[in-house]
Amino acid sequence: MDSKERIDQLTDQLKEAGYRYYVLDDPTMEDYEYDRLYRELEELESAHPELARADSPTKRVGGEVLSQFEKVSHSVPLMSLQDVFSMEELNDFLEKTIAAEGNAEFSVEPKIDGLSVALEYVDGKFVRGATRGDGTVGEDVTENLKTIRSIPMTLTGAPSRLIVRGEVFMPKKSFEKLNLRQEELGKPLFANPRNAAAGSLRQLDPKIAAKRGLDIYVFNVQLADGVEFTGHTQSLE
C-alpha cells in the first residue's frame, strides 16, 4: 500500500470512528487505537502534505491564532426566538396562531442554552461558520467550529449550497472538567455552561477552543438551494 492509499484509508477510518463516537454515541474504536492511527496520519501528511485530504480529521485543529474575528453578513437573517413565561402567554400564542392558520401543526423541540451559529456548506464542503451576532451580521468563527467533532466537514448528497442553524453548547461534563482546570490554575471559574460555551467559541486561538469539549445541536435549515420544504418538520427529517 502506497502513502496515498494509506492516507485515504486512515482518513476514512478516523472519520467513521469520529462520527460514531461524537454523533451516534456508539464508539467502535478504543481511544488508544484512535490516537495511534491519528498520529500515523499526522506523520504521513507531514511527509506528504500534497496528499492530505481537505476532510482529514487533522484539519480540524491547528488554525493560526487570529488577531480578531471578521464580520460576516448572514445570507438569511438569524431571527431571535420569542420567550413565553407563563401558561397564559403560551395559550395566547396558540389561540392566535390557530386563529390565523386554521388547523395548525406544531413542532416541539428542546431549547439548548448556548450560542447560536450558522454553518454554510458549498458543494458538500463546510466553508464557513458564523455567530448569530445581531441576526444580520455575526462573526466568522469557522476555525473554532471546525474543532467541534460533531460538525461534519463534508456532506454527501447535500444541496449545492446549504446553510443550517445550530446551537453551540458545552455539555455538563465538559463544563465541570473546565472549571476544575480553571480552579487548579487559580483562574476565575465560569458561572454557567452557556457563558463557558460562548467564551470558548470566541477564543482567538482555535487550539484553546479545541480543548473545551464543545458540541452542537442543529435545529433549522436556513437555506437549501433547489430544495423546497412543506414545513419545518420536513426540513428536520
Label each PLM-derived region with a short phrase.
Residues 1-237:
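RNA/tRNA-interacting regions in translation and RNA-turnover enzymes
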